[in-house]
Amino acid sequence: MGSVGVLIGQGFDAHRFAPAGSGRELWIAGLYWPVPDSCSEADAAKYEGIEGDSDGDVAAHALIDALLAAARLGDIGSLFGVGADAHGAGMHGIDMLQEVVAHLASNGYTPASASVAIIGNRPKIGTRRAEAEAALSAAVGCPVSVTATTTDHMGFTGHGEGIAAIANALVEKI
């Protein structure tokens, strides 16, 4: 194999929304999404958190897999484990991202650029896109763009059952 240069990786993550009344907080792209004060009780369920061993931040988790894939260092499960007793249990996605960046550096890689597409009907990512990009970029140490889309009411994200994200990342050998 010749010189490595820039490597690309792709990641995906999906989680089901937690049942209403579960007490789970909604974290996406490193941001907490509180229930708006003006929200009706019926609409408040739309801000229920995401099921998962950690905070369920699909954007952060997809980005983690993309970074690790680019450097050929495994995936989120191989680094943080799976289940309630895993190393990553209860962790916030931003903290996991920072740990991944340190892991990349210790293996001779640095993030160069990344993109995350969040797929779901809620919450409305566009209202906080700049914040999401800033939070993820700060955690990773490179520019991270964030886009959002729906599936026109198709599939589990379209039916409001959950949310997903796809990420691509470039890393450089240092």
Swiss-Prot record:
Source species, domain of life: Bacteria
Catalytic activity: 4-CDP-2-C-methyl-D-erythritol 2-phosphate = 2-C-methyl-D-erythritol 2,4-cyclic diphosphate + CMP
EC supergroup of this enzyme: lyase
Record has Lyase as a keyword: yes
Residues reported in the UniProt entry to bind 4-CDP-2-C-methyl-D-erythritol 2-phosphate: 13-15, 75-77, 149-152, 156, 159
Cofactor: a divalent metal cation
EC number: 4.6.1.12
Pfam family, one: YgbB
Cofactor remark from the record: Binds 1 divalent metal cation per subunit.
UniProt site (Transition state stabilizer): 53, 150
Keywords from the UniProt entry: Isoprene biosynthesis, Lyase, Metal-binding
Coiled-coil region(s): none
GO MF terms, alphabetically ordered: 2-C-methyl-D-erythritol 2,4-cyclodiphosphate synthase activity; metal ion binding
BP-aspect Gene Ontology terms: isopentenyl diphosphate biosynthetic process, methylerythritol 4-phosphate pathway; terpenoid biosynthetic process
Binding sites annotated in the UniProt record for a divalent metal cation: 13, 15, 61
Self-association and partners: Homotrimer.
Stored NCBIfam families: ispF
Function text: Involved in the biosynthesis of isopentenyl diphosphate (IPP) and dimethylallyl diphosphate (DMAPP), two major building blocks of isoprenoid compounds. Catalyzes the conversion of 4-diphosphocytidyl-2-C-methyl-D-erythritol 2-phosphate (CDP-ME2P) to 2-C-methyl-D-erythritol 2,4-cyclodiphosphate (ME-CPP) with a corresponding release of cytidine 5-monophosphate (CMP).
Protein family: Belongs to the IspF family.
Listed HAMAP family: IspF
Protein name, entry field: 2-C-methyl-D-erythritol 2,4-cyclodiphosphate synthase
